[in-house]
Amino acid sequence: MAAARLLLRLAGRLESVSFTQSVCGLLGAGQRPGPWHTHCSLERGQLVLSSNPFPGASERLPIQRPLFCPFAALDQQPEVSKTEPLTNRGVDLGVAVILQSSDQTVLLTRRTCTLRISPNLWVPPGGHMEPDEEILECGFRELWEECGLQLPKNQFSCVLLGLWESAYPPRLSWGFPKYHHLILYVLVISQESQEQLQARIQVNPNEVNAFMWLGPDVAAAVVATEDGTRTPGLFSQDLPLSVCATELKDDGGTQPLVLPMPTLMRTTPTTAEEDKERIGAGTKFALQLWLQHLGR
């Protein structure tokens, strides 16, 4: 099946993006840190981006990539991309849902250790956009497939938060990237409480093995770690020492899981061998956008 399409409007022309090209770079990011803003046209199965306004653009969203983005590094090493496989592939589109309860907490899930992409990582529910899908259709499908959640009609609202350029492996020091995604984060604000939502969660054990809810204070501490301004163990005394989560048992039931704060504040390591359970860099960016939406 064909994938949903990502197109860039460059110098007035629509162009596709090859696998090894940095989306942020093509939009004029250069080597300076982001986020930047891009104008977007959102259609069924297609996303068009441009650094300048264009007819049909309906949104202007922040877009970001990690400082260690391998595709930004490849832009500086063009000879590498010519010798590696997968260069004839494009960039896949994904949608991730930041589900906010009426208590102002958001849902994160832990990917199973058997998944090919980003195993053991804490992320919001989400996945690939199919070629015939709208953005919200994709987000709600993934929320159902991963967490068994369907939201009652007229009891939620949605806000497009921003875009994240994602690679896996996430660093060139881990190896040449095998996956290249542009992820659109959608904030879904439910009128139901965390307790009401949690009572209906039934995670898919093939994709998810734990879930948790983060409040603004913990989210702010997590966000502060990615740019190196803090290190694990150095955080406000007002924060809890741990966060309560729910873990899937082998028999299909659930059990409480205590996550120490330093686990949530880990950053992306230099090598794959050092990688441990953590919150993904893209998720930290999404949490930052969520906090901005709350006025934090």
Curated annotation (Swiss-Prot):
The keyword Magnesium applies. Its EC number is 3.6.1.62. The keyword Magnesium applies. Its cofactor is Mg(2+); Mn(2+). Mg(2+) binds at E142, E146. Keywords: Hydrolase, Magnesium, Manganese, Metal-binding. GO terms for molecular function: hydrolase activity; metal ion binding. Residues 90-236 form the Nudix hydrolase domain. A motif (Nudix box) lies at residues 127-148. Disulfide bonds: none annotated. It catalyses: a 5'-end (N(7)-methyl 5'-triphosphoguanosine)-ribonucleoside in mRNA + H2O = N(7)-methyl-GDP + a 5'-end phospho-ribonucleoside in mRNA + 2 H(+). Acts as a decapping enzyme capable of hydrolyzing monomethylated capped RNAs (in vitro). Hydrolyzes monomethylated capped RNA after alpha and beta phosphates to form N(7)-methyl-GDP. Shows low activity towards unmethylated capped RNA. PANTHER family: NUCLEOSIDE DIPHOSPHATE-LINKED MOIETY X MOTIF 17, NUDIX HYDROLASE, NUDC SUBFAMILY. Belongs to the Nudix hydrolase family. This is m7GpppN-mRNA hydrolase NUDT17. The lineage of its organism: Eukaryota, Metazoa, Chordata, Craniata, Vertebrata.
